Amino acid sequence: MDLNTQRSKLYAQLQGQLIVSVQAPDGHAMRDTHTLTHVAAACVDGGAPAIRCGGYGGLEDIRSISNRVDVPVFGLTKEGSEGVYITPTRDSVRAVAESGATVVCADATFRPRPDGSTFAELVTVAHDSGILIMADCATPEEVLSAHKAGADFVSTTLAGYTEHREKTVGPDFDCLREARELVPDAFLIGEGRFSNPADVAHGRLIGANAIIVGTAITDPGFITGQFASLLH
């Protein structure tokens, strides 16, 4: 299937939908590929039309989840914890493409990448590998730049996680709204600190084509803490 057909099919499939991020960092009780694969399958059973995964579980998580679920997989690696670390290099993009992901997610901020590449070069590598690419951005300006560079999906994933924008308590709705104004024709995904259905509904209302939720759905520790805090 050529890229244009892939893109059109995914846009139709994901418009107005919830994508679930299934990840766990090193040291987390859920940091086990087998466990996260079952979590991803449960999310699909619950209606998730796509899964975002990989992160510190890397290619092993992507391969395992891609083999288990029959929905598109947005794959990424996390390499380190400072600067650009989400699928940060051309080699990282190629590796995710070869792991079975449908879409590769990569940092599209204006910060320097470890291999000196530009985001536009990552787009080229992804497309040459036969895979679509999602831009993880921190500011509306980065969303615009990534869209111009050829990203198939643009997102607010990193809003509040770089020095260019303060971290909001919940989702950065202003970032999402401003990004929508700058890229009216892009497939814009809201991500980052969406923790309840009201957040998701508001994100859609102000212009997101789809919303990604992770921790609030897939982290039992976070969910338990939300309930426990009401009783203390």
From Swiss-Prot:
InterPro entries: Aldolase_TIM, NanE, RibuloseP-bd_barrel. GO terms for molecular function: N-acylglucosamine-6-phosphate 2-epimerase activity. Keywords: Carbohydrate metabolism, Isomerase. It comes from the Bacteria. Pathway: Amino-sugar metabolism; N-acetylneuraminate degradation; D-fructose 6-phosphate from N-acetylneuraminate: step 3/5. Belongs to the NanE family. PANTHER family: N-ACETYLMANNOSAMINE-6-PHOSPHATE 2-EPIMERASE-RELATED. This is Putative N-acetylmannosamine-6-phosphate 2-epimerase. It comes from Corynebacterium glutamicum (strain ATCC 13032 / DSM 20300 / JCM 1318 / BCRC 11384 / CCUG 27702 / LMG 3730 / NBRC 12168 / NCIMB 10025 / NRRL B-2784 / 534).
